Amino acid sequence: MRKSYKFIISVVQTKMKILWNLKLINNERLLQIDNCVIAANHISLFDPPFIGSVFPKEIHYLAKAELFKNKILGKIISFVNAIPIRRGTIDRNALNAVEEVLNKGDSILLFPEGTRKSNKVKAGIGKITSETGKNILPIYIQNSDHLWQCFFRKKKLMIVIGEIIDITEFQSIEDRKDKYRKIAEHTLKKIYELKNECENS
């Protein structure tokens, strides 16, 4: 991990703990994570840095291409391994970049629902994991959209680390679109099952 990257995530971690009452559940599972697709629900602009900061290794992200038009912001998010993706279309360049990241042994954070305003799963994560053979780490984040309540200790910023999803069982499905869809739906189901751990802690 680059020293500058490590400094950035340590600052984010400190802010999450002190300002927003962070509770990280199942953090011991992070030590076993290497080269996978990290899949999480998406409720806030802060989700990528919050989730990324809990990992002991650098990870990569997808960010909408419009953000890179701002030169300063573009440099910042590129520095923390963001990959631009064009929304509303099949962005082959972004998909190729994601596969390149995974094939060289790194991990990438994806949001199966695509955007914060969507509650429908996108099949993209199924395509990526099926074609690269990489497993999926589900993560559930709660209250990143209620930071003021977290600041005043009315809520906790919570991140739950799930168990690795082995996609091997899906690889025998012959219809590719059906396979991608089933992987994506199963992943989203596993993400939202982690919500129970927030409520029980």
Annotate each language-model stretch with its function.
Residues 10, 17, 30-89:
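Catalytic core of membrane glycerolipid acyltransferases/transacylases, capturing the structured
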Residues 23, 87-95:
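Glycine-rich, highly charged phosphate/nucleotide-binding loops
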Residues 14, 28-30, 51-52, 74-75, ...:
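Short secondary-structure boundary/capping segments
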Residues 22-24, 82, 159:
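Generic structural signal for residues in well-ordered beta-strands
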Residues 28, 65, 86, 140, ...:
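Residues at the C-termini of beta-strands that transition into short coil/loop
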Residues 3-4, 93-201:
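Non-catalytic C-terminal accessory region of glycerolipid acyltransferases
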Residues 1-20:
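Extreme N-terminal tail/first-helix region
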Residues 14-33, 155:
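N-terminal signal-anchor transmembrane helix
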